[in-house]
Amino acid sequence: MVSKEKINRINELARIAKERVLTKLEEEEQQILRKEYIEAFRKSFRKQLDNIELVD
């Protein structure tokens, strides 16, 4: 699971990107954080799907 601080930073970088162009370092940080978030989401979602049991 991604920490609350990292999610807040992702959102902060998104707000900054709407106001101005991100620096190279900010862009790299944003890509890394987004990748980490998506990997955690997929892992969690996959776990939920694996626990689903169909009943007829």
Swiss-Prot record:
Q: What is this protein called?
A: UPF0291 protein Clos_1191
**Originating organism:** Alkaliphilus oremlandii (strain OhILAs) (Clostridium oremlandii (strain OhILAs))
The record's section on InterPro entries has:
DUF896
| Gene Ontology CC, one term | cytoplasm
- Keyword Cytoplasm (UniProt): yes
Keyword Cytoplasm in the entry? The reply is: yes
| Annotated coiled-coil segments of the chain | none
Classify the main location.
Answer: cytoplasm
Q: Which family does it belong to?
A: Belongs to the UPF0291 family.
| Superkingdom of source | Bacteria
Key words, A-Z: Cytoplasm
Please name one Pfam family that this protein belongs to. Answer: DUF896
Subcellular location per the Swiss-Prot or TrEMBL entry: Cytoplasm
